Amino acid sequence: MLQDATCLDLFAGSGVLGMEAASIGAGHVVLVEQHAETAKHLAQSIDTLNLGNICTLKAADARSFLERCEAPFDVIFVDPPFADTGLLEAAVNSICEGGLLGQWLYLEFDQQQEAAVNALLLKHGLSLAKSTKAGATRSWLIQTAEQSKF
């Protein structure tokens, strides 16, 4: 799934999702992080791990980035801060309505958002491929309708 894939790590934070994708074969990973200090540490991690040829850091607000983004990504990781419950819905809507989702969408969210996330999947014709839970955190791997036919 990740071999040579173009990936987007939205709300990158520590960058663990995007850098892991890069380390196991992604072709290119864009990491988006709005907090300056976090982005600075993320840039240092990319440099330390010699991932600069695969990873591109965008120090930007996720919503603004999605509004300007034109190219689709094979895999998109969305793990927004749980405190702002509107971020997840806004991001998924922007991704789907902007034609940015190529094949796979990975979401991490609080269990209290599960019904809202299910509604988003229905709204955009997406399919849940795999789900896990750890305490109150839900992790869902979602595929596009086209991908689920294979």
Pin down the residues of each PLM region.
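Class I S-adenosyl-L-methionine-dependent methyltransferase catalytic core
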Residues: 1-150
